[in-house]
Design a protein with these regions (language model features):
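Short aromatic-acidic-glycine turn motif
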Residues: 11, 20-33
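Intrinsic-disorder/low-complexity, polar/charged segments enriched in Ser/Thr/Lys/Arg/Asp/Glu/Gln
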Residues: 1, 14, 59-61, 206
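Asparagine-centered strand-capping/turn motif at beta-strand->loop junctions
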Residues: 1-9, 21
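Intrinsically disordered, low-complexity Pro/Gly/Ser/Thr-rich segments with frequent PxxP/GP/PP motifs
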Residues: 30-71
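Acidic, contiguous N-terminal accessory segments
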Residues: 75-215, 219-250
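Feature activates predominantly on carbohydrate-active enzymes
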Residues: 199-387
Length: 388
């Protein structure tokens, strides 16, 4: 059941109510109190009864019989809505959380940070926990870390770590000069270690990182940086090693995260920040889902219509609002230069990008931009589970 409230001071008439969200009105659905107009996947247009005038303070309720799947969350209903008038103009409509008949828990959004324990199960703060930890003594937390890299691989890792910490923790000064109180960090090549393995040796007044290459050195620095941040921010909970050893290597060779930018677009700066977060947690694969029914996000010179047409959604465009977007034009795509920059950014952090182009299925956006790819004998007798 969906209710439109007129909170304005004047009556409205001759309108259509358009909405989208995760919810999907089935192709066989019926409406009580109105009529179903246009419908594509998660986009639905509702027509009020003929001649309806919604006065100031009045409400109009429509009951839809036939959703593609039942609601499970308060975000499953209409997340974006607007009124459409005959002249093509629109008026944004505010939406409220979906409620079910009966009891409703308070809506939650975002995350609930896990509290830092007063008495932790480990003396230092490292995630994931290393394979081998043998610390004989903890000492004072240094003001920061002075990276004394000499060979090319250590220098590249040190530069990447500096950029990583400045990106994620700009004001903390984790990397600093010796004259600013930084703890000396030395780098030593050990060819017997695996590519992502590292060993930290703590001695009074310095730390040594042993690795076989750039990624191993970077992971060693990240381990050291995590320890420093834990001891710096929670000195009564975690310590900083003065003597001992830490040795680690990933248990899994493929440690990935998937991001669907076709259904919801994120800009290049947001992608670079996500890569920084992946690196800080030592993930080494980024699954970049760049196309789907809802949009196409990659610039290709030979097919400019892909981004000119299918990178955008909105009222009056080739692809309507979907998954909660509103009437306004929304979306975007990644230029070739932006993609090159993102790939280089990932490589610096030991991350391999796995681009995902969803075909031959999930090609609605592709076929909207290049209609000659459609089978001329296809009559549209069936649809995907997503309603395309």
């Amino acid at each position: 059941r969906l209710t439109l409230h007129n909170d304005g001071a004047t009556a409205i008439d001759n309108f259509r109510l358009c909405f989208s969200g995760p919810c999907q009105v089935d192709a066989t659905a019926t409406a009580e109190g109105g009529h179903i107009g246009r419908r594509l996947s998660t986009f639905t247009e509702l027509l009020p009864p003929e001649g309806l005038e919604l006065g100031a303070g009045a409400s109009w309720t429509v009951t839809i019989h036939g959703l593609s799947w039942p609601f499970q969350h308060w975000t499953d209903g209409a997340r974006g809505a607007y009124l459409l008038f005959p002249d093509g103009s629109t008026r944004q409509v505010a939406t409220t959380p979906t409620k079910r008949m009966g009891g409703n828990a308070a809506p939650k959004r975002g995350m609930e940070p896990y509290p830092v324990p007063a008495r932790p199960p480990a003396p230092v703060s490292v995630i994931p926990w290393p394979n081998h930890v043998a610390l004989t003594r903890l000492g004072p937390v240094p003001a920061g870390l002075t990276l004394l890299a000499e060979d090319a691989m250590a220098t590249a890792a040190a530069a990447a770590f500096r950029r990583l910490t400045e990106s994620l923790f700009a004001v903390e000064g984790i990397v600093r000069a010796a004259e600013e109180g930084g703890l000396p960090v030395h780098f030593h090549i050990r060819q017997t270690l695996a590519a992502e393995a590292h060993e930290l040796v703590f001695t009074p007044g310095s730390v040594a990182i042993h690795a076989s290459g750039q990624t191993g050195f970077l992971y060693g620095l990240i381990t050291l940086g995590q320890i420093w941040r834990g001891a710096h921010h929670y000195p009564h909970t975690f310590g900083f090693p003065a003597e001992g050893q830490i040795a680690d290597a990933p248990a899994m060779g493929w440690r990935g995260l998937h991001l669907d930018v076709a259904r919801r677009f994120y800009g290049a700066a947001e992608i670079r920040r996500l890569l920084s977060i992946l690196a800080w947690n030592k993930l080494n694969r980024f699954h970049w889902h760049l196309s789907d029914d809802e949009a196409w996000r990659v610039e290709i010179d030979a097919y400019p219509a892909l981004t000119a047409t299918s990178a955008w959604r909105g009222e009056g465009l080739a692809i309507p609002p979907l998954l909660g977007t509103g009437a306004e034009r929304s979306g975007g795509y990644y230029s070739k230069a932006a993609i090159r920059d993102i790939v280089g950014h990932a490589q610096e952090y030991g991350i391999e990008i796995v681009p995902e182009i969803d075909m031959p299925g999930h090609c609605h956006a592709l076929q909207i931009a290049i209609p000659e790819l459609r089978d001329p004998d296809e009559r549209g007798s069936y649809h995907s589970v997503q309603g395309f």
